[in-house]
Amino acid sequence: MLGYVHLTAGRPVLERRAAAGMTYWALEGDLDGGLFPGRRLRRWIGRLERCGVSHAALPPGREGNFAPLRPVLPDGLRLALLPQLLNALAPAGDTALLLADCADSRALLAAQLLARRFRHLRLETGAEQEALERQLLRQLGLTTGGGPAAVTVTFGPPPREGLPLYLTPDCALRQEVRYAWLDPSQAPPPEGLLSLLHRACRLPEICVKSVETLDRRRENLYNAT
């Protein structure tokens, strides 16, 4: 069973909800208040566990406070929506740079998506990079290389060229992504809920509205429009 934790003001409320055919437990409220905030938090974590919750979308940067619940992070969701994220950033240039510590299946998927959008793709993917390059050549006829990057997509190493796009486990602390349902009358969905839907293979069609870099050295807002 999946869970969703949202810290807000007010008394905590735990309730079962449904979205896009997926049921989950939602816990919302102030979990840090009271005379013994640590005790309150542990009590509510215990209630989630008794409801069968083992994985949950948790407040960014607070994942360790909710052990033994395992976090559902947004990096997988963002990888799945990489083309829309690139549209929101709208980088001006024909070269992309992909950074990763190893050329795993996630790096391959990102490389394939980038190769379909940019004329040139540079790779710095550590171990197995040559195998990744051969696979891209065989599948897409792509030879890697190019000039300065208009955008850097990273799974870990710090970006140093062009507009950054983070697919790291802590991506929610580095960039804020705003989403919208196709029906504009519906309230914008929180990324935590979308991450749960993606994990459950229940993600409906959604729109990426904007990507805001939270790194204080690069406080820029890039809108899809």
Regions found by a protein language model. Name each.
Residues 1-7, 55-58, 94-103, 122-125, ...:
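Short hydrophobic beta-strand segments
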Residues 1-6, 145-176:
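Short, well-ordered secondary-structure micro-motifs within conserved domains or adaptor modules
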Residues 69-85:
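A glycine-rich, Thr/Ser-enriched phosphate-binding loop motif common to dinucleotide/cofactor-binding enzymes
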Residues 91-148:
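Glycine-rich phosphate/diphosphate-binding loop of Rossmann-like nucleotide-binding domains
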Residues 1-23:
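N-terminal basic/disordered segments at the start of proteins
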Residues 17-19, 28-30, 166-225:
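Adenosine-phosphate binding glycine-rich loop
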Residues 34-50, 79, 83, 107-111:
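Well-ordered, non-membrane alpha-helical segments in soluble/globular domains
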Residues 41-70:
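N-terminal glycine-rich phosphate/adenylate-binding segment common to multiple enzyme folds
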